[in-house]
Amino acid sequence: MTQPFRIAVAGLGTVGAEVVRLVAARRADFAVKARRPVEITTVSARNRSRDRGVDLAPYAWEDDPTRLAARDDVDCVVEVIGGSDGPAKALVEAALAAGKHVVTANKALIAHHGQALAERAEAAGLMLRAEAGVAGGIPALRALGEGLAGDVQTRVFGVLNGTCNFILSEMAATGRAYREVLEEAQRPEVAAVGHRE
């Protein structure tokens, strides 16, 4: 039997809970693409008792997210805690130091520490992926880093944020006012706006 690719998720707000739901719902699809089973083993968040609309019973729980990095049943840490420093940065640094791959949707962390973290990951032969936090999940970083690596980029134009895409699409489709659509986009079930888990 092929060894599964084991994931830990830190942060169970809108994005983290959706990651858990998607991995559970699309396990077979991910296994085909990864050529081995993909499973979440462990989760972590500030409030263990909060209802997130997803079943967390199958997963081990860590109150301290940095402890995810030391677990033997984790190959990759998904960091969706948020913030440029504090627990998010400590977790990513610990994960890389422990030989774990990292996926993050944390724009602030990448903006402030992305270069140093990327260098650390590359030196260790690990993957640090931040595409989930860029351009609403469009594979823009991969296209720039791999597909256009031999070209010189001088500019990139576009709406590169999922919330902006939602707002502009809703305004165009419905004719509603900006403020009304913005308020809808800020609801927790539509967009994760400043919510930290």
Walk through the language-model features, giving the residues of each.
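General beta-strand structural signal in soluble alpha/beta enzymes
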Residues: 61-63, 78-79, 103-105, 128-132, ...
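N-terminal glycine-/serine-/threonine-rich beta1-alpha1-beta2 phosphate-ribose binding loop
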Residues: 1-98
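Glycine- and other small-residue-rich loops at beta-strand/loop junctions that grip anionic moieties
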Residues: 12, 79-81, 106-107, 132-133, ...
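Short acidic, glycine/serine/threonine-rich loops at helix termini
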Residues: 20-21, 53-56, 114-117, 139-146, ...
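Conserved active-site and cofactor/substrate-binding residues in soluble primary-metabolism enzymes
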Residues: 10, 14, 18, 63, ...
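Conserved anion/nucleotide-ligand pocket segment
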Residues: 145-197
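Rossmann-fold NAD(P)-binding glycine/threonine-rich loop
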Residues: 83-98, 105-146
